[in-house]
Design a protein with these regions (language model features):
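Hydrophobic residues in well-ordered beta-strands that form the structural core
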Residues: 13, 53, 78-80, 109, ...
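Predominantly a Rossmann-like dinucleotide-binding segment in NAD(P)-dependent oxidoreductases
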Residues: 84-163
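C-terminal capping/lid region of NAD(P)-dependent oxidoreductase domains
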Residues: 76, 103, 281-285
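Rossmann-fold dehydrogenase core element
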Residues: 65-84, 104-107
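Contiguous beta-strand/loop segments that form the cofactor/metal-binding neighborhood of enzyme cores
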Residues: 142-218, 249-260
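Beta-loop-alpha module in the N-terminal Rossmann-like domain of NAD(P)-dependent dehydrogenases
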Residues: 2-70
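C-terminal helix-rich "cap/oligomerization" subdomain common to oxidoreductases
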Residues: 6, 27-29, 177, 237, ...
Length: 285
């Protein structure tokens, strides 16, 4: 009731079940701890609700597949919430690659490292599937898969674990069938109590490279990326970026109202789940 009054909502619910039982509710956004995504996505879809669910949809490919089967059985939409995938910044970088600006992609490197969290945070607890791979690494896995449109043949990974048995720092190297390589590092190791984050990317091609920062940025503003050619020329391009969460919700709304294809498809979510599962197996999570 306090939340309703503060933000001016029409209704407040005493439980998730009460919300799902309301026939006026058409869609829900699930941002619960990782261990609860699967359970409540299933309950919501069986109640006839469209579901936008935070990443990761589930801890393994098998459960991700089951979620999409449940969506089809109940004639509802399910989309994994990767807000940054809706960003004009990512769209612009993808277009540079598609247009051949840097030639054939040879190598992708990315990093997403944030401040340390206190021990009570759900990201730091094994029982809620915490750890940097589930929380941050999925940005780099999805970025790599989205740019290369193929899955790696070989995955090597190593991690540093905390006392709570979650990965605090993970590094991954991937090799693809045609010789391409990709690597990333994710972590929650920057100084505690400082609102700091490092997220950056580099894409190297046969004719040049693209470098950028804040690829997972979710606020209003401008973002820039730099194109460097093999001849040594350099160009900085700036992109206006609105709030990615808004773009994500608007796109999901169009799926419901206009049967638009989800920006993050079932096929993509399954590919990403497979890759994350391989990484977690490699590091012994």
């Amino acid at each position: 009731e306090q939340f309703k009054e503060k933000f001016g909502f029409e209704k407040a619910y005493g439980s998730y079940k009460e919300l799902l039982d309301d026939p006026e509710v058409e869609a829900v956004y699930i941002a619960l701890p990782n261990t609860l995504h699967y359970e409540w996505a299933v309950k919501a879809m069986k109640s006839g609700k469209h579901v936008l669910c935070e990443k990761p949809l589930a801890p393994c490919e098998k459960q991700v597949k089951e979620l999409f089967e449940t969506a089809k059985e109940n004639h509802v939409y399910l989309m994994e919430a990767f807000a940054y995938q809706h960003s004009p910044y990512i769209t612009a970088i993808k277009k540079e690659i598609e247009d051949g600006t840097i030639g054939e992609v040879c190598y992708i490197d990315s990093a997403f490292i944030t401040s340390d969290y206190n021990k009570g945070n759900i990201r730091m607890r094994r029982e809620t599937l915490g750890g940097c791979t589930y929380d941050l690494g999925v940005y780099s896995t999805s970025l790599t898969l989205g740019l290369l449109n193929e899955e790696p043949e070989k995955v090597e990974a190593s991690a540093i674990f905390s006392e709570e048995k979650i990965d605090k720092l993970t590094s991954v190297v991937m090799e693809f069938a045609d010789g391409k390589k990709a690597a990333f590092t994710c972590g929650m190791t920057l100084a505690t109590n400082q609102d700091r984050r490092l997220d950056c990317l580099e894409i190297d091609g046969t004719k040049g490279s693209i470098t950028g920062t804040k690829f997972a940025f979710n606020g209003d503003g401008e973002l820039s990326y730099t194109i460097r050619t093999a001849e040594g020329q350099e160009e900085v391009k700036t992109v206006e970026v609105p709030q990615n969460y808004r773009l994500e919700v608007e796109q999901f709304g169009r799926c419901i109202d206009e049967n638009e294809i989800p920006a993050v498809t079932e096929e993509f979510s399954l590919k990403n789940a497979r890759l994350v599962e391989r990484i977690l197996e490699e590091i012994g999570y």
